[in-house]
From Swiss-Prot:
GO terms for biological process: antibacterial humoral response; antifungal humoral response; innate immune response; killing of cells of another organism. This is Acanthoscurrin-2. Belongs to the glycine-rich peptide family. It comes from the Eukaryota.
Amino acid sequence: DVYKGGGGGRYGGGRYGGGGGYGGGLGGGGLGGGGLGGGKGLGGGGLGGGGLGGGGLGGGGLGGGKGLGGGGLGGGGLGGGGLGGGGLGGGKGLGGGGLGGGGLGGGRGGYGGGGYGGGYGGGYGGGKYKG
């Protein structure tokens, strides 16, 4: 599998971080999430613990929590909730939803789901996934 995301580095950006598989979101981020797009990894983070994209174990924020914690405007659960996950487009996998993951730009779940551009690549500019 080839993940194409943000900047360099295996976890800090690119493969898993910065819009990568485990990061996703408008601002991206690795396993811990963070940034404007909210963390989709295990830690969440960003604007109000999840930010626009929500996600992570804690979830919360504008896009709703997509992780195990849920919360926020759209609610959560394992796959659903938020503007994208279960709302506009439906979330897939553990991360799901957010403004892009399954919503505006599509998204294929995993632990992070898509970002604004959707897909495993996530991130603001999208990203490409090849199986």
